[in-house]
């Protein structure tokens, strides 16, 4: 099993700290592990089409909003607090439930670029589009998404300091890779990191509510 560190390649199993001060590999007992799973994003690295990659990334990350609502809302409120069909109402509910504004702003940025494709079928992402998304995700602070240290701070630090350059498939990209593919790889990596940060905060919030369930794995 690979340690969750600089390469950020493991999936649901992470080095975490529980209320009982247990350390080591644990399994998260809910559907948030999906957003920490690099294999969900890996197929996108072979797609050489901006619109297709952006749409799939948007759908992956929008699914987080539903998972956040379903996990974080107060038990018994399911009839009244539930995901809408549309992005903006779902995001508004998430913010009302405590989702940090830095994460919300990153989601809005991604959705706004997705909408450019919806309104102009031949739209091409500009360098500024890529940079705006990356800057927005980089602005999400480690203390904001891991306030209760549900995750070991040291194991996360490199990802937060290096950003997308902490990912092996970005660092090890072939020199001869076309610039378009290089930018798409960085986009996939950036949204993967955003997905991780979303999961980090949600798990911290569940810990705050004393509803975080995880089991220590056997050696």
Where are these regions (language model features)?
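Amphipathic alpha-helical interface elements
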Residues: 2-219
């Amino acid at each position: 099993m690979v340690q969750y560190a600089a390469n950020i390649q493991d999936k649901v199993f992470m080095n975490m700290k529980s209320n009982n001060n247990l350390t080591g590999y644990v399994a998260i007992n809910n559907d948030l592990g999906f957003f920490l799973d690099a294999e969900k994003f890996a197929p996108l690295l072979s797609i050489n089409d901006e619109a297709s990659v952006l749409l799939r990334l948007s759908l992956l990350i929008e699914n987080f909003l539903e998972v956040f609502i379903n996990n974080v809302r107060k038990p018994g409120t399911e009839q009244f607090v539930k995901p809408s069909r549309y992005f903006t109402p779902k995001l508004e509910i998430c913010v009302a439930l405590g989702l940090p504004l830095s994460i919300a702003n990153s989601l809005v940025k991604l959705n706004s670029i997705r909408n450019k494709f919806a309104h102009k079928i031949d739209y091409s992402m500009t360098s500024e589009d890529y940079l705006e998304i990356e800057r927005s995700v980089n602005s999400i602070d480690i203390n904001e998404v891991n306030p209760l240290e549900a995750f070991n701070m040291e194991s996360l630090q490199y990802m937060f300091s290096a950003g997308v350059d902490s990912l092996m498939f970005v660092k090890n990209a072939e020199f001869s890779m076309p610039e378009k593919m290089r930018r798409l790889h960085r986009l996939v990596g950036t949204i993967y990191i955003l997905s991780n940060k979303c999961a980090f905060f949600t798990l911290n919030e569940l810990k705050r509510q004393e509803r975080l369930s995880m089991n220590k794995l056997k050696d």
